[in-house]
UniProtKB/Swiss-Prot annotation:
A divalent metal cation binds at D96, E97, D198. Pfam families: DUF3378, RNase_HII. It is found in: Cytoplasm. This is Ribonuclease HIII. Keywords: Cytoplasm, Endonuclease, Hydrolase, Magnesium, Metal-binding, Nuclease. One of its GO terms (molecular function) is RNA-DNA hybrid ribonuclease activity. Manganese or magnesium. Binds 1 divalent metal ion per monomer in the absence of substrate. May bind a second metal ion after substrate binding.
Length: 301
């Protein structure tokens, strides 16, 4: 049995058909108990929609289901996976990245230094984890953050990314280098040595990268650190740099390039290959992704 309490919310019944169809595609078994529109279940998870619109999700797998499907695809709100941003009033640097899971576009690492008198201002602006914000809002907030705080962004465009990756042979080591470089620059600007990082690998990976730069840092690494205001601000700057970079590449090749690494990504990649050739395709993507092999292997078949 799950030790987690059931997740309960209210759903607009206009979305019931989409939810049902999605759950069927995800392999849920469907029944229709009394007073429900349906109840869907599979190992570790049950999702029940009542005729009143009450939606109940329970089971040991509920957190992943809610965070990665229900909230972004159905509810379009993020109260479960991204609760209210925490306010730590100690001046510190927050670091986050964007683009590591995206086939097209740059890898961007951003850092933001927040002083004590800036926390309330950022909170009033609505700064929070970029994953909960639209691209339009991200761009608006990024401009305001840059006007208010010290920041640094490491933007690694695909051609440079592929070159550096050949040296590191490991994405986490490349990310650690980018994090350490960002931290180094913000320490030089601010003098602050207290840093919070959204953890992406074993703690030793970033610590080693900092050691190589001879940086003495009071470092905290933790998962989902975007609940810290400085990290949330950094996530916005990193995301803004990424979406701007992706948009610029799309304009250059006159083909809309999607985020992520999905079937839509492969479709766009095949179009780039047909229109511009393999060399140009390689110059705008992260070549170690298996997506590239899929694109090159399927084109022409």
């Amino acid at each position: 049995m799950s030790s987690l309490p059931p997740f309960v919310t209210t759903l607009d019944l206009k979305l019931a058909e989409k939810l049902l169809k999605d759950l069927q595609q995800q392999g849920f078994s469907i029944t229709i108990p009394a007073y429900t529109r349906f109840s869907a279940s599979k190992k570790g998870l049950t999702c029940t929609l009542y005729t009143s619109g009450k939606l109940v999700v329970q089971g040991k797998e509920q957190a992943h289901f809610i965070e990665f499907y229900l909230e972004p695809e159905i509810l379009e709100s993020f109260g479960f996976s991204h609760p209210t941003t925490k306010i730590d009033l100690t001046p510190h640097i927050g670091i986050d990245e964007s683009g590591k899971g995206d086939f097209f576009g740059p890898l961007c690492i951003a850092g933001v230094y927040i002083q004590a008198n800036q926390f309330s201002k950022l909170q009033a602006l609505g700064v929070k984890d970029s994953k909960t914000l639209s691209d339009k809002t991200i761009r608006q907030l990024a401009s305001q953050i840059k006007n208010l705080c010290l920041y640094h962004i490491v933007k690694i465009n695909p051609a440079k990314y592929n070159e550096i990756y050949q040296d590191f042979k490991n994405l986490n080591h490349l990310l650690a280098w980018g994090h350490a470089t960002t931290i180094e620059q913000l320490i030089l600007q601010s003098g602050c040595q207290t840093v919070i990082v959204d953890q992406f690998a074993d703690e030793k990976v970033v610590l080693l990268a900092l050691k190589r730069k001879k940086l003495d840092v009071n470092l905290t690494q933790r998962h989902r650190a975007e609940d810290d205001l400085a990290v949330a601000a950094a996530s916005i700057l990193a995301r803004q740099a990424f979406i701007d970079g992706l948009e610029q590449l799309s304009k250059e090749i006159q083909i809309p390039l999607p985020k992520g690494s999905s079937s839509a990504t492969q479709k766009a990649g095949k179009e780039v290959l047909r229109k511009w050739g393999e060399e140009r395709l390689r110059s705008i993507c992260k070549q170690h992704f298996k997506t590239l092999d899929a694109i090159l292997g399927k084109v022409g078949k």
